[in-house]
């Protein structure tokens, strides 16, 4: 694969930031539902506290490490496309081949959690 230009990297970085926000929002919405369960009495405060702790030390930290600690923006975007947080047609034409290559080689049967 050709080396990406600065313009392509900038575009992929922007999509990566959008993907991180969308994916974190998705999981935070799931966490919010657990608050609703607590408010309705389906779980107690201790269970909710454990759920919050698990989210913070688990999914939230994993997303941070993946999106913020790494700088492989094309990989971030491929992950986001595979998991429907970014649509393939949102990717600039000049970057699509690179992202498609990653999708074909690294995200073949990766299910969305």
Predicted regions and their residues:
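Acidic, Ser/Pro/Thr-rich low-complexity regulatory regions
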Residues: 1-113
